[in-house]
UniProtKB/Swiss-Prot annotation:
<dbReference type="GO" id="GO:0045944">
    <property type="term" value="P:positive regulation of transcription by RNA polymerase II"/>
</dbReference>
<feature type="modified residue" description="Phosphoserine; by autocatalysis and LRRK2; alternate">
    <location>
        <position position="176"/>
    </location>
</feature>
<keyword id="KW-0391">Immunity</keyword>
<feature type="binding site">
    <location>
        <position position="47"/>
    </location>
    <ligand>
        <name>ATP</name>
    </ligand>
</feature>
<dbReference type="GO" id="GO:0005783">
    <property type="term" value="C:endoplasmic reticulum"/>
</dbReference>
<keyword id="KW-0256">Endoplasmic reticulum</keyword>
<keyword id="KW-0399">Innate immunity</keyword>
<dbReference type="GO" id="GO:0035739">
    <property type="term" value="P:CD4-positive, alpha-beta T cell proliferation"/>
</dbReference>
<dbReference type="GO" id="GO:0031398">
    <property type="term" value="P:positive regulation of protein ubiquitination"/>
</dbReference>
<keyword id="KW-0963">Cytoplasm</keyword>
<dbReference type="InterPro" id="IPR017322">
    <property type="entry name" value="Rcpt-int_Ser/Thr_kinase-2"/>
</dbReference>
<dbReference type="GO" id="GO:0002250">
    <property type="term" value="P:adaptive immune response"/>
</dbReference>
<dbReference type="Pfam" id="PF07714">
    <property type="entry name" value="PK_Tyr_Ser-Thr"/>
</dbReference>
<dbReference type="GO" id="GO:0050830">
    <property type="term" value="P:defense response to Gram-positive bacterium"/>
</dbReference>
<dbReference type="GO" id="GO:0043123">
    <property type="term" value="P:positive regulation of canonical NF-kappaB signal transduction"/>
</dbReference>
<dbReference type="GO" id="GO:0004715">
    <property type="term" value="F:non-membrane spanning protein tyrosine kinase activity"/>
</dbReference>
<dbReference type="GO" id="GO:0034142">
    <property type="term" value="P:toll-like receptor 4 signaling pathway"/>
</dbReference>
Amino acid sequence: MNGEAICSALPTIPYHKLADLRYLSRGASGTVSSARHADWRVQVAVKHLHIHTPLLDSERKDVLREAEILHKARFSYILPILGICNEPEFLGIVTEYMPNGSLNELLHRKTEYPDVAWPLRFRILHEIALGVNYLHNMTPPLLHHDLKTQNILLDNEFHVKIADFGLSKWRMMSLSQSRSSKSAPEGGTIIYMPPENYEPGQKSRASIKHDIYSYAVITWEVLSRKQPFEDVTNPLQIMYSVSQGHRPVINEESLPYDIPHRARMISLIESGWAQNPDERPSFLKCLIELEPVLRTFEEITFLEAVIQLKKTKLQSVSSAIHLCDKKKMELSLNIPVNHGPQEESCGSSQLHENSGSPETSRSLPAPQDNDFLSRKAQDCYFMKLHHCPGNHSWDSTISGSQRAAFCDHKTTPCSSAIINPLSTAGNSERLQPGIAQQWIQSKREDIVNQMTEACLNQSLDALLSRDLIMKEDYELVSTKPTRTSKVRQLLDTTDIQGEEFAKVIVQKLKDNKQMGLQPYPEILVVSRSPSLNLLQNKSM
């Protein structure tokens, strides 16, 4: 089958039909965004590769061939593929949009979902097994080999839709084009990978037994609502431990005695993650074990569980919106915020003392013209400013330990004594563009013409790693169809976000030896401190 036949067999969705592209997440298979199809008038999801260098025809055909296979895998618990967007600078798979996110979010966002009823947990496990069993029974069998809670999506009624199966070429292209310097697999994938797959030479033997191992780990995770190996930070430690026969702990703490059908489920887990692949059961046998478990629950209990989740999610969203509206009202009216004792732990007095220094003032970017910002971006921007300034890069005169002492992101917003971006306390105090910003503004068209795709992507990576760019701004840049439009959007964002943002871009231009832009300004790019990153990770 040639590339042209593959293209014609797949429904083609033009890029310009994908309106309102919004960044959702990024994984091994590419970046996922939501969009609204201009003709269908429905929300869709788009998984697209970042094409930093032109794909060879053979590479594009391989990716399209995989998409064609996925399009044929139509089943109740498989994520439906609606078509492909195949354009020179944009290659993406368009699927149905899943409003309830992933199983990973359901299990581990305990504030949003404080309780997930047992009937629903068992239904989810049953539907995962049904979906993978269907893939294994295709001709030829379609093996997932990247089954994890992040790839198990949930529709409006919390039914399972398995995603990212059969995307080995897609993942390969994404990793080869990746901007990250990390070569080791992400810990999230290692957790679900069987030990025989740690050695590349043995991958062919693993075959159909790979997915049942992953499923066993997922089952443990669903029943415990804990992250497997959550205390281990180094993926190599996990690999060594698993290769020695260790698995996530099965005891009363991880799997309490009140779990329905506990003994049967533990037996299924232990056989599924057996060290010897030949001792692991097929998904058919797994389903035979699960079916009597499902029959013990009345149909009404599944409906009640779903309704309860929807209620708690709605309450969580309503609370967040109420808080957001309250903050915006206080900002727009320039009203000081009366914080409780817990919120005062941010140390507003320290911040007030520092706010007088020109260095600190320069490091807190404020929009020069709100017309540059979309309404949603404005809201998020002001919310971000109104929180403790850990999301911004501070001047080098402020140490990481001082920044960490200023606030705990896990709990509280700071006092409004920090800044009010709408304050009218004198135009002379408005933040002026720094050296890097002024240089970028003076070289704008030269940068647009000369900044390479690789340099652009490295800049975005660096901004993400320093938490200097918001998701909304990232998506506005990354989803533009051409290199020049991406660069223009990035420079527009630089005008708004401030000096530290601009410094990163200047540094990346220098690193990529874009000599046509010389002379460069002398700048110092401040790296974020590990202590601050730790605080932020805990808050997410």
